[in-house]
Amino acid sequence: MFLNAEFFFFFFQISISYIRLSQVSMFVRRLHKFSYNPNYKFKCGLEIHTQLKTKYKLFSLSPTSYNEPPNTKLSYFDVGLPGTQPLLNPEALLLALKASVALNCEIQSHSSFDRKHYFYADQPLGYQITQHYYPLAKNGYVQLNKFDDVPDKVITLEQVQLEQDTGKTVNYDDRINVDLNRANTPLIEVVTKPDFENIDQVQAFVRKYQLLVRHLDICTGDLETGAIRVDANISVNDNPRVEIKNLGSSGEIVDALKYEYNRQVTLLQNNETIVQETRGWNGTGTESLRKKENAVDYRYVPDSELPVIRLDSHIQEQLENTLDELPDSVLDRLTKEPYNLQLAHARNLLFQPEVLNYYENIFGRIRDANKWFFHELLAAFAKSDVQFQVDIVSTNMLVDIVSAVEKNEISLTGARIILKHIIRNKSFSTLPHLIKELDIGKPEASAELDDTINEICQQIINTNADVVEKIARGHANALQVLIGQAMKATKGKVHAKEFRSKFMELLNQ
């Protein structure tokens, strides 16, 4: 069930304005032609709100919930019932500390919580618990580099603070309903300094941040679901900054920044004043939401119900020593000896930790591991229209298949047949059993085998006169067509090189 916003003693009325198709077209064309004016300097900082992957909420024992029916995962504290008190979730604190260390921040030995006062339907307490005065971590940085497709650039961070999320409002024609399942979900807010000099850097930073929190299993990293929400503060020529709230996708971030830069440049060119304010993105432009508040407006006060967080002086070192290998380090390692992967392949592995573990498990156990993994195994899954799963073809099975090919027990075609069979049938049979079942073992050398190979090749030549003619005209690659038919006829039992030798012998007679 939803809680009607009237429960919170105020009523919203929403007016929806429809945008004509011609207006949308003009907007798209304007953004497509976007360019920076050298006389107007772009400056931007970000505030990134990140939902932490915890079992319970930040200050209560309610489970974190994103897809449950409205208002079904709540505690008395989540709905602001008088007399209830917060209790800090240590799992959320640990994830926030891991993120802070990964962002090269200085963990503070003492941090505390404050109340940020404002009244809105999705905030039943009448305030948000955050860390305004003494945040968890300060003075971090993120290094943008070649792995981010932008020139090297250091983005400095002011702080990382732990805070609670709000509920969610759901709009109807004549009312706003409130779902408090999300209320009190643990967040970290990462605040950068205004170091971004162009939108490419902003895009690269957000991508890198998403990858980092996913890789460390701190957050799902999804913008579209609200797991990460971005506020951008943009100014031109050091004029008052404008905040754009709740940008929910990479496309929105880019389009909103382009639009707002153009808007501010136009104001300055017309000798108009830029007002410090908060604006929202409506899909085609930014619109004013409210005059920009400052700390006085929010009446920050320390939260007397939560104790100060005191951390051991060695906590930073301990976390650094136990933190998983960070994405840049993984990419650097995979693109160098002995792996020598292309950056695109390395990125794909990094996005899928289980697949990366599989790849590293077989590397060193298989000659030409890159060829077998990317061009044979993954190709077999793709051709079977099955998503790669590490438990379908075990690492040991792949090693055994490659070994059988190298020992001439089966051909490469036979290996492909086995892989396809395992993937499509989810077979867990042993390799010897599969070779026997599929009848793809290499036949013993004999005069009878030579005669059979000769007969197969001659028959294929006789029925493919057009291909033979192409070969005669110098199209050597056409020979692969004949070899392919021969391999198919023998179910891959005979190696392709034997058919190649026989075809060349017969065609040169």
Swiss-Prot record:
Subunit record text: Subunit of the heterotrimeric GatFAB amidotransferase (AdT) complex, composed of A, B and F subunits.
Function as written in the Swiss-Prot or TrEMBL entry: Allows the formation of correctly charged Gln-tRNA(Gln) through the transamidation of misacylated Glu-tRNA(Gln) in the mitochondria. The reaction takes place in the presence of glutamine and ATP through an activated gamma-phospho-Glu-tRNA(Gln).
Sequence similarity: Belongs to the GatB/GatE family. GatB subfamily.
Record keywords: ATP-binding, Ligase, Mitochondrion, Nucleotide-binding, Protein biosynthesis
Listed EC numbers: 6.3.5.-
Entry-linked SMART domains: GatB_Yqey
UniProt protein name: Glutamyl-tRNA(Gln) amidotransferase subunit B, mitochondrial
GO molecular function, one term: glutaminyl-tRNA synthase (glutamine-hydrolyzing) activity
Transferase found in the keyword field: no
Catalytic activity: L-glutamyl-tRNA(Gln) + L-glutamine + ATP + H2O = L-glutaminyl-tRNA(Gln) + L-glutamate + ADP + phosphate + H(+)
SUPFAM superfamilies: GatB/YqeY motif, Glutamine synthetase/guanido kinase
Subcellular location: Mitochondrion
Domain of life: Eukaryota
InterPro entries: Asn/Gln-tRNA_amidoTrfase_suB/E (IPR017959), Asn/Gln-tRNA_Trfase_suB/E_cat (IPR006075), Asn/Gln_amidotransferase (IPR018027), Asn/Gln_tRNA_amidoTrase-B-like (IPR003789), GatB (IPR004413), GatB_Yqey_C_2 (IPR023168), Gln-tRNA_amidoTrfase_suB_CS (IPR017958), Gln_synth/guanido_kin_cat_dom (IPR014746)
A GO BP entry: mitochondrial translation
Stretches that traverse the bilayer: none
Keyword Transport: no
Enzyme class: ligase
Miscellaneous section: This protein may be expected to contain an N-terminal transit peptide but none has been predicted.
Lineage of the species this protein comes from: Eukaryota, Fungi, Dikarya, Ascomycota, Saccharomycotina
Source organism of this protein record: Candida dubliniensis (strain CD36 / ATCC MYA-646 / CBS 7987 / NCPF 3949 / NRRL Y-17841)
Any one of the GO CC terms: glutamyl-tRNA(Gln) amidotransferase complex
